């Protein structure tokens, strides 16, 4: 296999003169391409972390067998709500920990619920089967994303107490660090 490599010297090149205050990514998205525009840079009152200490927003979503499940249906003392995306690398990296967490607390008053925020039912069913998920996996909707203030980002972990008050919000996943943070929050509430 041959390779052609050409090298040229460039001097005083200006590639991008656009300033951040005038830049809008949606100017570069093809016309007709479906997009969602969230309030980037909006005041922090819209952030998920500001839900700590507040009642968790209620939802009714379908599980992978297309049966409705509501937050109010869950009677466990502690609930971990994981807002996830099946195309999200960090979300996939968290799966072994979440499966172990479900096994570890199976005799405790604990429930783990993952809410998929990016795809739809057929994809969820295949994903849950392929990943051998041992916890509840629900088909999310835009209202959950809005109510939980994730802005479409994933993963998020919301730890709820028996009164369904959000006691801790964790954004992102870092193996080891996030595992410890979630486990400590659950232990504190059990």
Task: Give the positions of each predicted feature.
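Non-transmembrane domains of secretory- and envelope-associated proteins
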Residues: 1-60, 65-67, 74
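Conserved redox-active cysteine motifs that mediate thiol-disulfide chemistry
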Residues: 75, 83-100
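Structural microenvironment flanking redox-active thiols in thiol-disulfide oxidoreductases
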Residues: 92-131, 141-147
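Generic structural signal for well-ordered beta-strand positions
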Residues: 69-70, 167
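A short, polar/charged loop-to-alpha-helix boundary motif
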Residues: 4-15, 176-188
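Hydrophobic beta-strand anchors of alpha/beta hydrolase catalytic cores
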Residues: 80-81, 112, 157
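Thiol/disulfide oxidoreductase modules built on the thioredoxin-like
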Residues: 127-133, 139-187
């Amino acid at each position: 296999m041959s390779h052609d490599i050409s090298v040229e010297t460039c001097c005083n090149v200006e590639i991008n003169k656009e300033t951040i205050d005038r830049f809008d990514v949606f100017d570069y998205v093809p016309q007709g391409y479906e997009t969602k525009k969230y309030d980037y840079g909006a005041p922090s009152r819209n952030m998920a972390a500001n839900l700590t200490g507040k009642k968790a927003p209620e939802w009714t979503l379908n599980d992978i067998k297309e049966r409705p499940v509501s937050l109010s249906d869950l009677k466990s003392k502690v609930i971990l709500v994981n807002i996830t995306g099946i195309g999200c690398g960090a979300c996939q990296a968290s799966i072994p920990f979440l499966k172990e967490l479900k096994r570890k607390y199976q005799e405790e008053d604990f429930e783990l619920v993952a809410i998929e925020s990016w795809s739809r039912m057929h994809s969820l069913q295949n994903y849950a089967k392929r990943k051998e998920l041992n916890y509840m996996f629900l088909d999310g909707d835009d209202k959950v994303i809005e109510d939980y203030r994730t802005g479409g980002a994933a993963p998020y972990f919301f730890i709820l107490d028996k009164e369904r008050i959000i006691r801790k919000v964790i954004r992102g996943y870092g193996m080891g660090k996030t595992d410890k943070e979630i486990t400590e929050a659950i232990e504190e509430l059990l």
